[in-house]
A protein has these predicted regions:
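Eukaryotic scaffold repeat domains enriched in small/polar residues
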Residues: 1-209
Length: 209
């Protein structure tokens, strides 16, 4: 869409699931590179296409990479995609409890597990990465809990953790922030799309820096 809400482009075929350059199964996130290339995370659930699809700014298919699996370059329910200020593509491989990092041609560069089960990824201009984890618990990802982890996107070092503000963060996995962004003043916003075990269900929550 344009900044005024006008539809500019449609990718995929409405009402039809599938593979190839003209179909998706469950696109869950999108990232735009500095040159206008479009990267789509196609695989909201573990049985979807589980791939990253790349188009140019005119919507012309360029390439895709990934399939269902556990190895580097394979995914299970990729739920988030974002491009850091260095141009690297960060993919939230949620059901594998990891972030995979690629260059823009799909070459695998690194795998990080210290951010939990990533549902949303964002960056600021001060070297920080923000990762929303809405699913970690003692069953799905032992040793981790739901929350927003803040670290350094160059090194992967995690130095801050925002616990979700209800009494027991380990009940009802999937009910925390699934989407995260940050403003120019460092305030953090977490989108909570699923009913939570507190009165502020389905909300956008602001955490003041």
């Amino acid at each position: 869409f344009s900044a005024t809400g006008d539809l500019l482009m449609t990718l995929g075929t409405p009402g039809e699931q599938g593979g190839g350059p003209k179909h998706f199964t469950s696109p869950s996130d999108v990232a735009i590179a500095a040159n206008g290339d479009v990267f789509i995370a196609d695989g909201h659930n573990a049985n979807g296409n589980n791939r990253v699809v790349k188009y140019n700014s005119r919507g012309e298919f360029l390439m895709s990479w990934g399939e269902t699996g556990y190895a580097p370059g394979e995914f299970r329910a990729l739920h988030a995609i974002a491009i850091d200020p260095n141009g690297r593509v960060f993919v939230g491989d949620r059901s594998n409890s990891r972030i995979q990092i690629f260059d823009q041609e799909g070459n695998h560069a690194a795998t990080w597990t210290q951010f939990g089960r990533p549902s949303g990824i964002a960056f600021d201009n001060n070297g920080r990465i923000y990762v929303a984890d809405s699913e970690s618990d003692n069953v799905q990802n032992p040793g981790y809990e739901m929350g927003i982890r803040i670290g350094e996107y160059e090194t992967g070092w995690v130095h801050e953790f925002i616990r979700f503000p209800w009494a027991n963060p380990n009940i009802l996995p999937g009910n925390g922030a699934e989407f995260v962004t940050v403003d120019s003043e460092g305030n953090i916003y977490g989108g909570e799309p699923v009913p939570n075990p507190h009165i502020n269900a389905r909300t956008l929550r602001k955490y003041v820096r």
